[in-house]
Design a protein with these regions (language model features):
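Cytosolic-side membrane-entry/anchor segment at the start of a transmembrane helix
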Residues: 1-34, 150-174
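Short, hydrophobic transmembrane alpha-helix segments
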Residues: 40-50
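Alpha-helical transmembrane segments
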Residues: 49-69
Length: 174
């Protein structure tokens, strides 16, 4: 289905522009930002280190799982559709309608910027041998990449496959 006409979209949460994936991505980004905002002023305290480390590792784990799931789903779709990695994880080309691409790209950009700024703030004022727990935030953008992949695997619009789809049984073993 081409994404040129948004008038066909309804308020149903299963439609591409109202997908729950978008809500999960925005919520995960919000959780990370709140954890970072709490952890920055208390970066030397153990509770803040566990908070930012735990949230970052949880979002990273979710991102890894969703990235792998999206890749497996995209492999299935690639038998009949021209699916590219950039289309899948960065929503390039006609993969997603502009509102979806805007939200998911902004969420990923916010994750990247917040992670880098948090890691940089964590370095400031560290004594030798101290832990920069805020640096765990650099793991979080994997969550955004995974959410992009899930959305694109479920709802993405791809062109028809240009070449003949190759089945694993079409190859002979030498």
């Amino acid at each position: 289905m081409p994404w040129h006409d948004d008038s066909s979209m309804t308020d149903d949460p299963t439609t591409p522009t109202r997908s729950r994936v978008i809500g999960v991505d925005v919520a995960g980004t919000g959780v990370f930002l709140v954890a970072l905002i709490i952890a920055v002023p208390f970066r030397s305290e153990r509770f803040a280190q566990f908070l930012i480390g735990g949230v970052s590792m949880l979002l990273f784990a979710i991102g890894m799982a969703t990235t792998l799931w999206a890749y497996a789903r995209a492999l299935e779709r690639s038998r009949t559709e021209e699916v590219g990695v950039a289309n899948l994880y960065l929503l390039t080309g006609p993969t997603a309608p502009k509102p979806v691409r805007r939200i998911l790209t902004w969420a990923l950009a916010i994750q990247v910027v917040a992670a880098v700024v948090g890691a940089w703030i964590g370095v400031v004022g560290l004594d030798k041998g101290e832990l920069n727990a805020l640096a765990f935030g650099v793991l979080v953008p994997m969550f955004g990449i995974g959410m992009n992949g899930v959305w694109a695997a479920l709802h993405g619009s791809y062109g028809p496959r240009v070449g003949r789809a190759v089945s694993p049984t079409d190859h002979e073993m030498d």
